[in-house]
Each structure stands twice: as structure tokens, then as C-alpha cells.
Design a protein with these regions (language model features):
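Short edge beta-strands and adjacent beta->alpha junctions
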Residues: 1-67, 73-84, 89-92, 102-525
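Short, solvent-exposed loop/linker segments at beta-strand-coil boundaries, enriched for Pro/Gly
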Residues: 94-98
Length: 525
């Protein structure tokens, strides 16, 4: 039976979304109009004409603040002469309304969640029937979550060739800037981007950190490398106000950096994310999902995902792609069917190596994704599906200040047990959190193995009371390692719903240290 150990509970509120929007409309923006006087009142004329409106103090002050990816909290302060009985109607700009009663001077607070991301015009109306008066104030606002738009895999940066930056290596403890907004068909106003970042020609060990251009560099890392290694890793990173992303070389010698885009995020309705419990779609060793046998050198396999593992209207998929048993050095490239293989790469490997990388890739019109073997000799390929993007999905990306949630080298309980797992409460009890963008790194590895990441059906209370159920060991891999290696990989992990507990499984027969950093989450409300 696997032994589970608890990691410290995360607190998304303390990590904080990267931006909270506030909106304001003062009382001076209130527009008054007189109502028809009721028949039989002293104010009514024989012809039923409108009266001059009473309650000259009637007005509204509107303030709103984003509370979630889709949600806002509206505060309406009702200004009025004393003694009035007031009715307030809230039109949210999406075809829905609410209404309340209010007293003069009262501040009414309401929360609202929009089904789709975007810009809305909220209209609030306060009516004083007794004085035949009505006031309207309007408040334009927008949601803060970001939806995903797939982008044909494209190389935006290659310091070896001068693509996207001056030709030449990135010097020690320096950054390369990658233009995102306005580059090619990428629009202005992009909030975040999915990039496959690769380091190569490294003379010494180090790490790479991706962060918004012009922003403060976090203490977390996105990929780690050793001398002579070529290492890729997927990053989902906010775009700076200048429209760029910075890639920092944390080595004491120069390196070459490569960045390939596969999609971007904006605050307009597009495709939301739905995480899944990882499922294996392809394993060429056994013939699952593809012909049995290695993918030939310079060969391609098509993987049917749309209509099988993900809905037929999925626009992109989140995968973990693994090369194993390669006969020579090379790379794998994932791309949508119906297109030519691009000059990008997703997984880089050495002969005999087993190596995985997270991939976000657009889906072809036929629901397929192609995987190209860029080596001149064969390799086996494994593809695990961990999620998808679609117009029907409501999971909007919310970046957080990057934070380290776990480092077993420093937490006092030692490394991960052989064949054991660590359970981590990230958003237990919170409604609407669908999944998380995490970076996992193993280090101080003693034996070959792999890491699996999966949602947990047990609650923290069950673990603390000793009543947890035994879990089925997952088989899908997030990253693979050999003895002595430090290996990172991004994972878009499912929350398992309101439970919000994620498990990290050591699939090795020896100990390993684990580091987990968080970069954001997907929210459905």
C-alpha cells in the first residue's frame, strides 16, 4: 500500500491573482427622469401630464471589484431624501437582472458571475414611486479571467540564428526578451502565453526563469539544466505591459535560448480549459492508439483525440509527450493535423534516454494531433492527455505571483518515500477552481523512475482522522528521470472539483526530492 504524506496546505488567496480590477461611477453620472404621476393624486393633471420629480437628492454611486475569473462584486450607494421607500434594479449587461429594496443612504452589495468573459455595461436603476422619481447610473466593467486561443506552433526566439533577438548567446545572469503582443498574428492586449522554452549549448549547470517583461523576476524556476544538456519545458507566463516575456539565464555562463508559441490568453471569450485525470492515448511499445513499433526516423504518427478522449469541438489539448528508447539523438514535434510539420520542437532526447515534456497544441479539423520524430532513427512515443481547451469550457486562466509550495529538501520530513505519494491541499473547499498550473522538479534522484500527478478523492479531514480510502496508483507519467538527474516539467493538474487535493506519486523504488511551484489556476466562476 502506498504511503501518503501531507504537504503544507496552499493558500490561493495569499498568493493573490496578478491583477484585481476596480471600477467606479460617481453620483454625478446619475441621470434623473420624472415618472408619470399616479392617477387621483394631487400632482396629476387632468391631461395626465408628467409631474416635476420630487426627491431632489436621489442618486447612485457605483463601485465594483473583480472577485474571480468570471465574477464581480457591485456596491451601490443609494442617495435619497429621508423617508423614501426605494426599489433598485440591477441590469448586469448579460441579459440578467436582480432587484432589491433600499433605504436612503444604504449601500447595497451584490455579487454576479458572468458565463462568458468580456466587457459589460452594468445599469442600476433606483425608483422612488412616491415622489415619481427615477435615477439611472451605468458602470462599464470587464472580467479578469483569460481564455485561450490556439496558435500554430511558431518559433518566436532562437538566439542561435537571431530569430526574435540579436544573434548570440544569452549571457550569465541576463535575460532575453521575447516579443509576444503584436508579433505575427498575436493581438495586442494578450495577457499570457503558452511557450515551449528550450535551453541548449550550456557550458555549466543553471536554470531559466520566465516572467513578464519589465516585471520583477520571481525566485522560482521553470527549467533546470546541466552542462551540455538541451532541455525544454512548457511555460504559461503572463505578458508584461510592454508586450514581452523575459527569459532569465540563471547560470554563470552563457546559453542559447529557444521559445516556441502554441497559444495565448486574452480577456475575451475564446476557449476555456477543462482538466482531466491523466489518460494514456498512445503507447507505440504496445500499439495503443498507434501502430505497434517505434516511430521511424523522420516519421510521423497521427493521434485521434477529438471525439475520443476530448470533445469534438476542442480547439487545443494539454498533453504529456514522452520519448523512450530512442536509437539516436533527436526531438519530437507536436502539431495539428492538416499542416506541415513546423520548425518547432517539444521534446529533446539523447540516444537511449526516456524524457517527457508537457505540450499544449492546437487540434486539427479532424480532431487529430501529429507527432513528428525529428531524429534519423526510430523512437517509441507515449502520449498522455491531461486536459483540453474548448468554447464550452469555462475554466479561465488566473495567474498568481509565482510561489514555491513544496521543497522536500527543506520541509523537515525528508525526500519522497519509494513508491509513496505526497498529498497537497491546494484549494480544498473552494468552489470553481478547476485546475492548477504547476511546475514540478525532481532532484537528488537515486534511481530511475517517473512522477505521476493526479487528483485525490480523499479530503484533508479523512487523512487527518485516518479514514482515507486507498488510492489506485496512476500509470500516466508527468516526468521521467535517471539516477543523479534534476528534471523539471510543467503540469496542468486537475483539482478534482471542490476537493482541491492533488497527489504527487514517486514511481521509483528509491527516494527523490520534489519541488513544486505554482504559476496560476483555472477558474470556472
Amino acid at each position: 500500500m502506498a504511503k501518503g504524506v501531507s504537504a503544507p496546505a496552499a493558500d490561493l488567496a495569499k498568493l493573490g491573482a496578478s491583477e484585481v480590477k476596480k471600477f467606479h461611477s460617481p453620483a454625478e453620472h446619475s441621470v434623473r427622469k420624472a415618472l408619470p404621476a399616479a392617477k387621483g393624486t394631487a400632482a396629476a393633471t387632468a391631461q395626465g401630464a408628467e409631474t416635476a420629480a420630487g426627491n431632489p437628492d436621489l442618486g447612485l454611486v457605483l463601485d465594483a471589484q473583480s472577485t474571480s475569473a468570471h465574477g464581480i462584486e457591485l456596491k451601490a450607494q443609494v442617495l435619497s431624501s429621508p423617508g423614501a421607500n426605494l426599489r433598485v434594479v440591477y441590469s448586469w449587461g448579460d441579459g440578467t437582472t436582480d432587484s432589491t429594496q433600499a433605504l436612503p443612504g444604504q449601500e447595497v452589495s451584490l455579487k454576479h458571475s458572468y458565463a462568458e468573459l468580456g466587457e459589460y455595461n452594468v445599469k442600476v436603476t433606483v425608483t422612488d414611486l412616491a415622489n415619481s422619481a427615477e435615477v439611472v447610473n451605468e458602470l462599464p466593467l470587464s472580467t479578469v479571467g483569460s481564455d485561450f486561443t490556439p496558435y500554430a506552433p511558431t518559433r518566436l526566439l532562437d538566439t542561435r540564428t537571431g530569430t526574435g533577438a540579436p544573434k548570440g548567446m544569452v549571457q550569465a545572469y541576463s535575460s532575453a526578451k521575447v516579443k509576444i503582443a503584436g508579433n505575427g498574428k498575436i493581438p495586442a492586449g494578450v495577457t499570457a502565453v503558452a511557450l515551449n522554452v528550450t535551453v541548449t549549448n550550456a557550458a555549466n549547470p543553471g536554470h531559466v526563469t520566465a516572467f513578464p517583461g519589465g516585471g520583477t523576476r520571481p525566485t522560482t524556476s521553470n527549467l533546470n539544466f546541466e552542462a551540455g544538456q538541451t532541455v525544454p519545458n512548457l511555460v504559461v507566463v503572463p505578458v508584461g505591459k510592454d508586450g514581452t516575456v523575459e527569459l532569465y539565464n540563471g547560470s554563470w555562463t552563457a546559453v542559447d535560448l529557444i521559445a516556441d508559441i502554441t497559444g495565448y490568453f486574452t480577456r475575451t471569450a475564446a476557449s476555456g480549459y477543462t482538466p482531466m485525470a491523466p489518460v494514456r492515448a498512445v503507447d507505440t511499445r504496445s500499439g495503443q492508439g498507434a501502430p505497434q513499433g517505434q516511430v521511424a526516423g523522420r516519421g510521423t504518427i497521427g493521434v485521434q483525440l477529438g471525439g475520443w478522449y476530448v470533445p469534438s469541438n476542442a480547439t487545443a489539448v494539454a498533453l504529456n509527450v514522452t520519448a523512450t528508447g530512442p536509437r539516436e539523438d533527436g526531438h519530437l514535434t507536436a502539431y495539428p493535423s492538416g499542416q506541415q510539420a513546423p520548425n518547432t520542437s517539444n521534446v529533446n532526447f539523447k540516444a537511449g534516454q526516456t524524457v517527457a515534456n508537457s505540450v499544449v497544441v492546437p487540434v486539427g479539423a479532424d480532431g487529430k494531433v501529429n507527432v513528428f520524430n525529428g531524429a534519423w532513427a526510430g523512437t517509441d512515443v507515449i502520449v498522455d492527455v491531461v486536459g483540453y481547451y474548448s468554447p464550452d469550457s469555462s475554466g479561465a486562466f488566473m495567474p498568481v505571483t509565482p510561489g514555491r509550495m513544496l521543497d522536500t529538501r527543506a520541509w523537515g520530513q525528508g525526500p519522497m518515500y519509494p513508491r509513496g505519494y505526497i498529498w497537497m491541499p491546494i484549494s480544498h473547499g473552494e468552489q470553481g477552481i478547476a485546475g492548477y498550473v504547476l511546475n514540478t522538479t525532481v532532484t537528488n534522484t537515486k534511481d530511475a523512475g517517473f512522477l505521476s500527478v493526479a487528483p485525490d478523492t480523499n479530503t484533508p479531514d479523512q487523512y487527518e482522522s485516518g479514514t482515507e480510502s486507498q488510492l489506485t496508483r496512476p500509470t500516466a507519467s508527468t516526468l521521467n528521470w535517471t539516477a543523479g538527474k534534476t528534471v523539471p516539467n510543467l503540469v496542468q493538474a486537475s483539482s478534482g472539483g471542490v476537493n482541491g487535493v492533488v497527489d504527487f506519486w514517486n514511481q521509483s523504488w528509491n527516494t527523490t526530492d520534489l519541488i513544486v511551484d505554482i504559476f496560476g489556476y483555472y477558474e470556472t466562476k
